[in-house]
């Protein structure tokens, strides 16, 4: 029996990793969860949690899957980056999605907007391999079930937490006005790193109005399915929503395109949403072309390809390609944070 580990730092990891977990179980293998921050309250019955470094080392997984940018290098197993979203060029010129930190053995890419660039980086660095698998979270999307528009239009508002890009301070008054004046239902959800003050402000709005709901949880897929239109700024949830063949209105998107209705003033939000609710044919055609460029897979088997990639890497490349960089400072920093020093006594993790 093969054993795998999920390395989790934020609650957005659940819908990314659970499809992989389902495929692991389908194959008769085992998987456990390890958390670096307190978000284990969303674990479900039957899901296994390892709480200490000692337990992880004794569990001895063959692979560690991380949706985030970091992973403990001293954990057993090949380190697999499965990403927490799509590349949307949120901060043009930064290239955050393609940053190589020397921590991962495998990058599981999504499609033509990410794979070619990572293959170039593979040639440059030579200490990891790239596999185009599609994104595991999209396994939850398919097969798509055609959905009629809601009798009362339903608007999902989601925003990035990134300072200077988030729309939350700028759109609150307009969203509050629309919620009071328009016969629309509002669903609101934010990134786990969103400012607590902002979260509290929008929660109060939801508590005050019957047609506004604030969602905090481990899986936003139901929200994506339920809404007719997404209102956003520059977040990868845009691409997730577009998979459902529905339009997006953005406020000052950092990389606007013909697949979005982008506006630069809160006063333009209302007419933009009204236009989006008509599902204009040209816009919908552009959405479908854009989504195909990000991920061509619609078969619900991205998680299976990810596990196959791990098997292929272990069989062909483990121990045979260039070693990852020493990263001594980062390793010492991590060891100090978790009070584990693998170059000393084997088990020195704090309780």
Regions found by a protein language model. Name each.
Residues 43-54, 76-85, 204-214, 246, ...:
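Active-site regions of enzymes building and remodeling cell-envelope glycoconjugates
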């Amino acid at each position: 029996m093969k054993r795998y580990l999920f390395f989790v730092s934020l609650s957005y990891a659940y819908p990314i990793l659970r499809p992989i977990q389902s495929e692991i179980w389908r194959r008769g293998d085992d998987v456990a969860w390890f958390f670096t921050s307190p978000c284990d309250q969303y674990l479900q019955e039957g899901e296994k949690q390892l709480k200490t470094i000692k337990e992880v080392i004794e569990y001895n997984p063959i692979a560690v899957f991380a949706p985030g940018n970091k992973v403990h290098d001293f954990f057993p197993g090949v380190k697999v980056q499965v990403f927490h979203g799509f590349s949307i060029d949120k901060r043009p010129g930064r290239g955050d999605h393609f940053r190589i930190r020397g921590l991962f053995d495998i990058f599981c890419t999504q499609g033509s907007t990410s794979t070619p660039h990572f293959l170039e980086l593979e040639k440059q660095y030579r200490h990891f391999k790239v596999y185009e698998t599609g994104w595991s979270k999209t396994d939850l999307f398919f097969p798509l079930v055609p959905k009629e528009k809601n009798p009362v239009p339903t608007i999902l508002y989601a925003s990035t937490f990134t300072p200077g890009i988030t729309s939350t301070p700028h759109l609150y008054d307009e969203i509050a006005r629309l919620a009071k004046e328009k016969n629309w239902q509002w669903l609101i959800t934010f990134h786990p790193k969103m400012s607590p003050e902002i979260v509290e402000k929008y929660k109060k709005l939801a508590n005050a109005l019957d047609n506004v709901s604030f969602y905090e949880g481990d899986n936003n897929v139901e929200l994506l399915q339920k809404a007719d239109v997404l209102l956003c700024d520059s977040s990868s949830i845009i691409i997730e929503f577009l998979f459902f063949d529905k339009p997006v209105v953005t406020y000052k998107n950092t990389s606007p395109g013909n697949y979005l209705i982008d506006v630069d003033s809160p006063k333009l939000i209302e007419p933009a949403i009204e236009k989006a609710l008509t599902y204009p044919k040209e816009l919908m055609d552009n959405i479908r072309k854009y989504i195909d460029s990000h991920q061509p897979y619609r078969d619900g088997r991205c998680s299976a390809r990810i596990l196959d990639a791990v098997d292929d890497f272990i069989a062909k490349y483990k121990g045979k390609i260039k070693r990852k960089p020493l990263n001594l400072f980062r390793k010492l920093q991590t060891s100090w944070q978790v009070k584990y020093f693998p170059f000393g006594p084997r088990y020195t993790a704090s309780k």
